[in-house]
Design a protein with these regions (language model features):
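Short, small/polar-rich loop/turn modules that mediate ligand/substrate recognition or access, typified
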Residues: 137-142, 195-198
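Alpha-helical segment proximal to the catalytic Tyr-Lys
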Residues: 83, 134-135
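C-terminal substrate-recognition "lid" of short-chain dehydrogenase/reductases
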Residues: 175-202, 207
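Active-site loop-to-helix junction immediately N-terminal to the catalytic Tyr of the SDR YXXXK motif
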Residues: 110-119, 131
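Residue(s) in the substrate-gating loop at a strand-loop-helix junction
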Residues: 105
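Active-site helix of classical SDR
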Residues: 78, 121
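Catalytic Tyr-X3-Lys loop
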Residues: 45, 56-76, 101, 125
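Conserved mid-core segment of classical short-chain dehydrogenase/reductases
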Residues: 46-64, 83, 87-93, 114-117, ...
Length: 211
């Protein structure tokens, strides 16, 4: 790890499906840095969960696991981050105390074969954003989600190459998004004090409805 980042990066093992683990991660972060101003819930999985195949019906155990990681894990993070942020001093003239960001997906709005659980989990993330933004507005904490399309990430790399090639070909820009482009979107959501209660797409005009 680069020497210049050693005091700015802090790693804590955490199973996001366990509320106590998430609380511990938040507590340790506050212990290390004093407080939290930005929290990004980005742990997630996209395990295949077809509704019905020749091998049988929907695997509800896998469905439950996807929901636990993608939805409950995000909710736990937001719960404990909000407690910390509510005690912060305002960081600007608008009185802002913190920003909570979720990672949604274009799959929340568009059908993908075999992704019943993933689509449901990201739809749940979109559904969390507005009520949470309204609940936390009184504490001057903003809440938003970012909904990426196809990105060059380890998760995307697990797809068969022919699927990756087809997805890239169907994107008007002819390529997946870059991690740096997602990072820029995160920075934009943090810096723009009027982004609140929304899920913003960053997808290069990709549409998944025919897949």
């Amino acid at each position: 790890m680069h020497a210049n980042l050693q005091e700015r990066i802090f790693c804590i093992p955490c199973d996001v499906t366990k509320e106590a683990d998430v609380k511990n991660a938040i507590d340790k972060t506050v212990e290390k840095f004093g407080t939290i101003h930005v929290a990004l819930a980005c742990a997630g999985v996209a395990w295949v969960t077809p509704t019905l195949t020749s091998r049988g019906p929907l695997n509800t155990k896998v469905f439950e696991s996807v929901m636990a990681i993608n939805v409950l894990g995000s909710a736990y993070m937001a719960k404990y981050a909000a407690v910390v942020m509510s005690k912060n001093k305002a960081v600007n003239e608008q009185g802002e105390k913190g920003v909570i960001l979720f990672v949604s997906s274009v799959a929340a709005q568009e059908a993908q074969r075999g992704q019943t659980a993933y689509g449901a989990s990201k739809g749940a993330i979109n559904g969390i954003v507005m009520p949470m933004a309204r609940d936390l507005g009184r504490y001057n904490i903003r809440v938003a989600a970012i909904a990426p399309g196809i990105f060059a990430t380890p998760m995307g790399a697990k797809m068969p190459k022919k699927v990756q090639d087809r997805l890239n070909a169907d994107t008007p820009m002819g390529r997946p998004g870059l991690p740096s482009e997602f990072a820029h979107m995160v920075g934009f959501c943090i810096e723009n004090g009027y982004i609140n209660g929304v899920s913003l797409r960053i997808d290069g005009a990709t549409r998944l409805s025919h897949l």
